[in-house]
Amino acid sequence: MQVNVLEYLDAGAARRCPDRVAVVDDGRSYTFHELQRYARQCAALLVRRRDVANQPVAVFLPKCAAAIIADLGIVYSGNFYTNLDVKSPPQRIRNILSTIRPALVVASRDLAPALHAIGVEVERVVFVEDALVESVTYDGDSLSRRLRDRLDVDPLCIINTSGSTGTPKGVTLSHRGTIDFMDWAFSALDLDGSERIGSLSPFYFDIFTLELNLCLAKGATIVIVPDRLASFPLKLIEFVAEQEISFVFWVPSIMVNISNQGLLERFALPALKKVLFAGEVFPMRHLNRWRRAIPGATFINLYGPIEITVDCTYFVLDREFGDDDPLPIGIPCRNTEILILSEDNRLCGVGEHGELCVRGTSLALGYWNDPEKTAKVFVQNPLHSSYADLVYRTGDTAFRNERGEIMFVGRKDSQIKHLGYRIELSEIEHQILRIEGIANGCVVYNSTRKEITLFYETEGHDVAPAVIRQALSEVLPKYMWPTMFYAVAELPRNPNGKVDRQALLARALETDRA
């Protein structure tokens, strides 16, 4: 039985096709043999710097082949990785590091000043450039022994997601959950290793987990899409065509932008065979444009919070949908059960809305260093008390249609999906209330326009939106900034004295953008 994801590489692509290209990064190609060797060299450097096992190691690198090598090197060393967003404000990075307390940090030399500025001692940093030279030696038997000491229930990585207190939560994924998900994906999605993956999502996003392990196990090629192309649909679609990309796993926002600009009619994409999407609702009228433009491709809608290891349901588009029809999130992945529970914890019937809960081996290990938050959402299955049986309460509302397909409705609370990112609106509010001159604030999400909208009270003098944006730029990534701002004399309240979020949401939906 497979215990560690590195068995995908060691017994898979590196053994079967060592000279095949594993990663393409801005014109530079790396074979599977090179990927394996550099990763082992990185592991050797990590162990020499600090001989620990089953500890978190942070990766502070932009999206590049070196980051993949660092991730694999960390796992070879018997530890687990967490990829950081180098573009995040320094305070957010500090918050993550203070929660995770990594044993070491892997970075590049050009990022050393940034690490120093946030308080990371140079003694804790291993520079990835040092692993990419021929002179590094390593003891293969020693690394193998380190891996043998690890169990499949040990952590593989930590993915940092928005937290309600202003500090991101570290979702801890295991080897077993990842292996279970990938074994399902290989079979259900008919993945055979011929794929050229157009890797667009950041490596600190959970989509990378599928891309990486498809590469390692089957010999698929990861073609890293340069970050600079993400905001330019024309350049992005040109890249997909020129690189003969055959597999993408993108958030719908990117695909909607391409559709909106009429680019699907201008570019033939005969190589594109698998189109996966997740993270937010894909408007059917835009999805239909994609299906008409690439009739030979298979389109698959996936759903799942990070806490269940990438995704837990899927829907292969196997029939026609009208432009206004809702799109199912489908059926559970293998070895996963979806429970839709009512407020009184009974199973909902067909058409009845309830909270979507997940059970199975793909559940995360919890939130790193936060047992209290973990216990709130990873709970005993409320349908019985006969044995320990954890379920994850997603906070999403869903129902089953007459076909037995699961239909997503929305969030139960203030957590949203925006541009593919999961965001706690309360984290934004937490930072808003720290801005001088703001007395109170409430953030709502206009899902129709995909706008984060801020309503706020001031302390007697105007606080311009530009001032708010500047303050938020120091603590939050850009995708979490409000895009609409409304200063109000007083926030509306409901009978129990709380801010009436529904009234504000209604106002946001009714307000003319002009």
Label each region the model flagged:
Residues 1, 5-6, 105-148, 178, ...:
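AMP-dependent adenylate-forming
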Residues 1-158, 173, 180, 283, ...:
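AMP-binding/adenylate-forming domain of the ANL superfamily
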Residues 10-11, 65-85, 185-186, 206-220, ...:
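Hydrophobic alpha-helical segments in the ANL/AMP-binding
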Residues 61-65, 82-98, 109-112, 220-243, ...:
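ATP-dependent adenylate-forming carboxylate-activation enzymes
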Residues 61-64, 85, 191, 201-205, ...:
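Conserved AMP-binding
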Residues 142-160, 167, 191-197, 203:
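Conserved pre-ATP/AMP-binding loop-to-beta segment of ANL
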Residues 169-196, 206-246:
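Conserved AMP-binding/adenylation subdomain of ANL enzymes
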Residues 217-220, 245-249, 259-328, 337:
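Gly/Ser/Thr-rich phosphate-binding loop
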